[in-house]
């Protein structure tokens, strides 16, 4: 906390990533959030060496700065099955989300301040896919309980890209939403990603430094 005098530092120990959420809404900034679990934390304002926190003061490295992704011009692909969802000029996406949950749990113990350990649970990948209802293609997939795929590529103007691939998903819900006169009919679908025996993963994520 550099606005403090002396500067205060807080150190979080044994951190593990529990949740990652990504939301794509139309004509907006792509929004992501992270949730972490840890053993405990410590705080000190004993500048400059902070002996309560470190055996040796670490080197501070500034985070790299990049332009944020927007959902208008930075979406390289949003696909279901072989083709992009809107390949036929129909069923454009209103909103898409990915929610990854590692189902971690803090393990308390007598005589331990904080957590004695972090328990690892089963990976869960869910999300939503809301599209315009221009034909019955997605509705048939939902009604027939068919397996399909979902993939997303964000691509910035500088070539930086992120790839999210779910080779096996099933929709757990979704029905045409008819809001009223002079309004668009949509399908707000919810899905669950499943482990693919072919590829050996439920979801794959990749960062690409440059792509065109």
What kind of feature is each model-predicted range?
Residues 1-212:
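Signature of extracytoplasmic/envelope-associated structural regions
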């Amino acid at each position: 906390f550099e606005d403090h005098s002396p500067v205060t530092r807080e150190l979080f120990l044994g951190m593990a990533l529990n949740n990652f959420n990504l939301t794509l809404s139309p004509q907006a900034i792509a929004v992501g959030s992270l949730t972490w679990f840890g053993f405990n934390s410590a705080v000190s304002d004993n500048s400059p060496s902070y002996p309560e926190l470190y055996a040796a003061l670490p080197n501070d490295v500034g985070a790299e700065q990049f332009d944020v992704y927007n959902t208008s011009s930075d979406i390289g692909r949003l696909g279901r099955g072989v083709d992009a969802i809107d390949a036929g000029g129909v069923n454009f996406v209103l909103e898409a989300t990915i929610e990854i949950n590692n189902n971690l749990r803090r393990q308390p113990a007598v005589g331990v301040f904080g957590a004695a350990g972090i328990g690892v649970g089963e990976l869960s990948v869910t999300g939503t896919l809301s599209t315009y209802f221009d034909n019955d293609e997605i509705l048939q997939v939902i009604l027939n309980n068919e397996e399909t795929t979902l993939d997303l590529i964000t691509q910035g103007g500088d070539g930086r890209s992120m790839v999210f691939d779910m080779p096996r998903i099933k929709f757990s819900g979704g029905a045409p939403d008819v809001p009223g006169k002079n309004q668009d009919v949509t399908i707000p679908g919810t899905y669950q990603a499943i482990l693919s025996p072919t590829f050996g993963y439920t979801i794959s994520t990749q960062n690409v430094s440059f792509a065109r």
